[in-house]
A protein has these predicted regions:
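Acidic, glycine- and Ser/Thr-rich low-complexity intrinsically disordered tracts
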Residues: 59, 151, 155, 162, ...
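Right-handed parallel beta-helix
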Residues: 1-11, 24-41, 53-77, 85-91, ...
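Short, solvent-exposed loop/turn segments at secondary-structure boundaries
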Residues: 18, 54-58, 170
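Short, contiguous acidic/charged loop-to-helix segments that flank catalytic cores in large enzymes
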Residues: 116, 141-147, 169-175
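Extracellular beta-strand solenoids
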Residues: 16, 45, 89, 119-120, ...
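Non-catalytic carbohydrate-binding regions of carbohydrate-active enzymes
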Residues: 137-141, 162, 166
Length: 246
């Protein structure tokens, strides 16, 4: 469990696993953290090699939960080849125990990245009820890294991005794998709202249109608590300065 930390200006905020995938990270809980202005990742969970038979290491399907965090790279991040997303999630075990493990992210705020996407992931993922704002580029990239995206659900998120809102690139899945990447019920204001995946019931509009729509109250509260600003998107809202839910 990683809970209630403030990490400001680090090289990498949270790094879980090992660069070669040899350090198991299983069934974690990461919640109520503020991670801002890192040089590299706010959070990186490395890909996993097949799970070793170690006493005490959970077997079967496990879920890692990432919830109620703020991940921001508004300042201080690397550019060029050294640029990194706010959050990168690697794949789980490719065979044996852990192949059905999933990483679930909900209730998080992903805020600004001048040089990269806000989120990148592969493996088994579920992203729901998060808020993404990037004035500079992409929000969500589901794409191969050390393996491929497997079963992925991007559901009910609010996304404002100058670049692509949700990008899905599947890579080459094993024959008969039947992996599915679903993009469902999101509200997306972006230069290119959705590119790839099985898309349904999404509300999409150009990036600039976000200025005319109210944002959720909880998003305003989360951002203002950490002294961020969404006034760019609120300045032209024809709703008397109110937010959704008031």
């Amino acid at each position: 469990m990683i809970r209630g930390n403030e990490i400001v200006g680090a090289g990498t905020g949270l790094y879980l696993g090992n660069s070669d995938g040899s350090a198991p990270f299983v069934g974690g809980l990461i919640e109520h953290n503020l991670v801002v202005d890192t040089i590299g990742y706010n959070l990186q969970i490395k890909h996993q090699r097949p799970r070793p038979d170690v006493p005490g290491l959970p077997a079967g399907k496990n879920v890692t939960i990432i919830r109620y965090n703020v991940f921001s790279k508004a300042r201080g991040g690397s550019s060029g080849p050294a640029a990194r997303p706010n959050v990168l999630i690697g794949h789980g075990s490719l065979y044996g125990p852990g192949t059905d493990d999933v990483t679930v992210l909900y209730g998080n705020v992903f805020h600004q990245n001048p040089a990269e996407a806000l989120f990148q992931g592969e493996g088994n993922l579920a992203l729901h009820g998060n808020q993404f704002v990037n004035d500079h580029g992409d929000a969500i990239r589901i794409q191969p890294h050390n393996d491929i995206p497997r079963n992925v659900d991007v559901l009910g998120n609010t996304i404002v991005a100058e670049g692509t809102g949700v990008l899905v690139r599947t890579g080459e899945a094993p024959a008969g794998a039947g992996f599915r990447q679903a993009v469902t019920g999101n509200v997306v204001f972006a230069g290119r709202p959705i590119d790839g995946g099985v898309s349904s019931a999404n509300t999409v509009a150009p990036f600039e249109a976000a200025a005319y729509y109210p944002v959720p109250c909880d998003f305003q509260f989360a951002i203002s608590n950490f002294q961020f600003s969404i006034r760019r998107f609120a300045s032209k809202r024809p709703v008397g300065g109110r937010c959704l839910g008031e």
